Amino acid sequence: PMDTYSYSASKAGVHHLTRAMARRLGPEHITVNAIAPGPFESKMMAATLKAAGDSIARMAPLGRIGRPDDMAGVAVYLASRAGAYVTGAVIPVDGGIETTS
């Protein structure tokens, strides 16, 4: 397995920054949120998915790898009126993988 210390630390930093900026910018009626993607079809994940895509998909309760339209739906929600009262949230879009760790 590959060590992911620096990657994990950078993601934790993004999560903290999201909450801190939401608190700071909320009085200006500015929402700040983050999307935390799990494994998705992408150039970055291509080699990993080729080597282990089936086993990664089995880890997700939804049983598959994320697709671009899965991510787009969350982004549209946050950018729309429907997400106007959501701030400081880190939304996992991972097929439920977060629930298994």
Residue ranges and their predicted role:
Residues 31-41, 79, 92-94:
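Conserved SDR Rossmann-fold cofactor-binding beta-strand/turn motif
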Residues 2-3, 27, 37-60, 70, ...:
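A glycine/serine/threonine-rich, flexible loop-to-helix segment
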